[in-house]
Amino acid sequence: MAAKKGAKTSTKKSDYYKVEGNTVERLKKVCPKCGAGVFMAEHLNRFACGKCGYMEYKKNEKTESEE
């Protein structure tokens, strides 16, 4: 029988916000389809939403400067 895996640790929502005085700033990009409260994962070359599957590719600075 295979060994049981440990429980996954969830992320704290407070890690996605920065509070300064009376203002709150989001540190991660928000999904435009799902709306506020659903953050997009940042990968090497893209942003992806885990809820709806929406994906945005990052602009490649290397190819733009060569043109």
UniProtKB/Swiss-Prot annotation:
Zn(2+) binds at residues 31, 34, 49, 52. GO terms for biological process: translation. SUPFAM superfamilies: Zn-binding ribosomal proteins. The keyword Cell inner membrane does not apply. GO terms for molecular function: structural constituent of ribosome; zinc ion binding. It comes from the Archaea. InterPro entries: Ribosomal_eS31, Ribosomal_eS31_arc, Ribosomal_zn-bd. Keywords: Metal-binding, Ribonucleoprotein, Ribosomal protein, Zinc, Zinc-finger. The keyword Zinc applies. Its cofactor is Zn(2+). Signal peptide: none annotated. One of its GO terms (cellular component) is ribosome. A zinc finger (C4-type) spans 31-52. Gene3D superfamilies: 6.20.50.180. SMART domains: Ribosomal_S27 (SM01402). Pfam families: Ribosomal_S27. Binds 1 zinc ion per subunit. NCBIfam families: PRK00432.1. Belongs to the eukaryotic ribosomal protein eS31 family. HAMAP family: Ribosomal_eS31 (MF_00777). Part of the 30S ribosomal subunit. This is Small ribosomal subunit protein eS31. It comes from Methanococcus maripaludis (strain DSM 14266 / JCM 13030 / NBRC 101832 / S2 / LL). The lineage of its organism: Archaea, Methanobacteriati, Methanobacteriota, Methanomada group, Methanococci. The gene is rps27ae.
